[in-house]
Regions:
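Conserved acid/base catalytic micro-environments in cytosolic active-site loops
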Residues: 1-290, 313-330
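Short helix-adjacent coil turns
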Residues: 251, 292-299
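Short, charged, amphipathic alpha-helical segments
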Residues: 298-309
Length: 331
């Protein structure tokens, strides 16, 4: 009899401690393969391997392309590759980044949902923004079980809270109980298989690097008057997405909050560049005014002095906007 033998776990900020707890508490005879993606800098992947290997009793492996996975083993995402499942093998995809990261939690979750449906248990841990919420929703749509770490105890509550809202999670569990809960759920028979929605299949193919282009994207998204921060292409609004998401023609994907965060960074950078240019312009025109005075051209000097004062006013306005942006609360 089949069981829930695929466990996928995702997290980012503040997720290392609960992950260690889960791995320490998973039963050594758990009848499931465990796949983990944490959104970390590339250099953090090695640290994750060390932490995971020393945390529990299950063998831990760095995922490689084509690797056949086994129950009772743990597999970690590789740097700069999406961790994807295909049948009983692992695929490493070089498709576009999602929320500016690769490997992406959502890509792993979708591929598990596509190939293993109700046999999947998805878990979202502590983290910022809404990474993992879309993938958890895909697992739910394919008949799998969805779990989030209790946001009240998470170091960064956004990810589990957004996942709760987007996927109507089956369970909300403190980290101290997750290992035991997963071990017990893995022994249960899965529910009935549900039809696979075309958008889930297509987005898995995009993550694998197999499908790109605006014509393909038109099947799942409508054009939006927005620009991709990564490539400058046109973004499209993914239809009926929970949470709201966007993809560009190249395939870069963003939840609404991740896109807003990237836009804020671009606005801040643009304002700072504008401030530097105007400050330099004021300095140059002031020097031209001084040169006019030295050379007996008072009218020219006065004109340049007035212009320099105008530029300084513009610079002060931009400087106030930049300083105000630093005081805004994180969103």
């Amino acid at each position: 009899m089949s069981n829930r033998d695929i466990i996928v776990i995702g997290g980012s900020s503040g997720a290392t401690a609960p992950l260690k707890q889960i791995l320490a508490d998973l039963h050594p005879d758990v009848p499931a393969a465990v796949f983990i993606v944490l959104h970390l800098p590339a250099q953090g992947i090695g640290i994750l391997s060390t932490v995971a290997a020393g945390a529990g009793r299950l063998p831990v492996h760095q995922a490689t392309d084509g690797m056949k996975f086994e129950r009772g083993h743990v597999y970690l995402g590789a740097p700069d590759h999406h961790l994807l499942l295909s049948g009983d093998h692992i695929r490493l995809g070089r498709g576009p980044r999602e929320n500016m990261v690769r490997p992406a939690i959502d890509a792993l979750f979708r591929s598990a949902a596509l190939h293993h449906g109700p046999r999947v248990i998805g878990v979202v841990l502590s983290g910022l923004l809404s990474d993992g919420a879309a993938g958890l929703n895909a697992i739910k749509r394919c008949g799998g079980m969805t779990i989030v770490q209790d946001p009240l105890e998470a170091i960064a509550a956004e990810m589990p809270q957004r996942a709760l809202e987007a996927a109507t999670a089956d369970l909300c569990v403190p980290a101290a109980r997750l290992g035991d809960v997963l071990s017990e759920l893995a022994r249960e028979a899965p529910g009935a298989a549900l039809p696979i929605a075309p958008d889930i299949r297509l987005e898995v193919e995009i993550a694998a690097g197999e499908r790109i282009g605006s014509a393909i994207l038109a099947d799942i998204a409508d054009p939006a008057a927005l620009t991709c921060p990564a490539c400058g292409g046109v973004l499209s609004d993914v239809k009926e997405a929970h949470p709201m998401r966007f993809r560009c023609q190249v395939g870069h994907a963003y939840t609404a909050d991740a896109l807003a965060k990237e836009q804020e960074g671009q606005v801040d950078e643009a304002l700072r560049v504008a401030l530097r240019i105007i400050d330099e312009r004021a300095e140059l025109v002031q020097r031209m005014a001084a040169d006019g005075r030295r050379n007996g051209r008072p009218a020219i000097a006065e004109m340049y002095a007035l212009r320099a004062a105008e530029y300084r006013e513009y610079a002060d306005m931009i400087r106030r906007v930049v300083l105000q942006s630093l005081d805004l609360p994180n969103r």
